[in-house]
Structures are given as structure tokens and as C-alpha cells.
């Protein structure tokens, strides 16, 4: 039987964290690295002491991240050795196949590649440094920061927005001029064609 636990905190090596998705937005990671670098040593310690990475324990007791992949990657790139995690569920009694099925059905996994295509569970990287860039995930994050849509608790909401933009903004436009693509995406986000997406804020009045 699946064991749900009361959240408990423990320090874990960043290098040992296991992703539950294939992609992140490298632009998002760069912004988080800037935020970390702007903190004094004291404030950085306080930040790490209050920002916990939520994980689910899998086979062999490994820590599988179910959120904050961008922060975990930023910490890795900044040379942070360990971080506190919050253990939300203990599924360590399951074999690998059953574990992945449970994660998938609990919306604790996003096995989609940088083209928005679903991939086998085996394609999910084994460590945060192997996560792949999806520029449209960065675009979705930028549009949210600009007020294009509201933060929403729907699992992987930003990836739904990323897929929406992927179908409407060419990769060449996004690659050549991120700011221009962001302005176009902001316009799209406020149109009624996006009203099915989590956090949609209505048309621009």
C-alpha cells in the first residue's frame, strides 16, 4: 500500500535528486541563478533554510523531485552541495514500473520532451544536470511574470501554456528574439482562445 507521510525535512545532496520531468526552461534557471547570486551569505542561508524541494521517496529510497526543478538546477549550477527536501510520500516499497505509474497518475510526473511529445519513463533524466532545455517553458514563465496569466495550482500549468505557445509561435522567432516572442505570447495569452488554460486572466481590456 502506498504510504503517505506527514511532510518531514531532511538535507539531501543536490546531485542525488531525481527529476520527474524531462525539460526545464534554461532562461528560468538563469533568472533563479541571478536571484541566488544577489543574496548575501546570510540571506542565502536563510533562503535555503526556508525553500524546501518537495520529493517523493522511490525505489531504493531515492528522492524524486515533484516541483522546483528550476531551483534545483540553479542550485546545482551555483555549486550548492545540499538542500533541504520535504518528503511528501514514501513509495519506496514499489518497484520501478509501479512507482512510475503512480507518479504519472498522481500528476507528479511530466514525461514530455522539448517538442511537447510524450516519452517513455526511461527518458526522464537521472539527475538535475541532465535536464533538457525547452525554450517554450521559459516563454511561459516570462509571460506569467509579465501578468499574462495568474499563478495556478494545476500540476505543470506552465507546461500547458508552453504547449499553447509552441503551436502558435515559431521556434525561429523565439530563438532570434526572446523579448519579441514574449510580447507576442502576452497578446495570445489574453485572447479567448487561451481561456481553457489554468490561470487565464481574461482578455486585455
Describe the function of each predicted region.
Residues 3-46, 50-62, 76-205:
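Surface-exposed, charge/polar-rich loops and edge strands
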Residues 64-67:
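Short hydrophobic beta-strand that contains or immediately precedes a catalytic carboxylate
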Residues 70:
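Active-site-adjacent structural elements in enzyme catalytic domains
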Residues 73:
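Cys/His-coordinated zinc-finger cores
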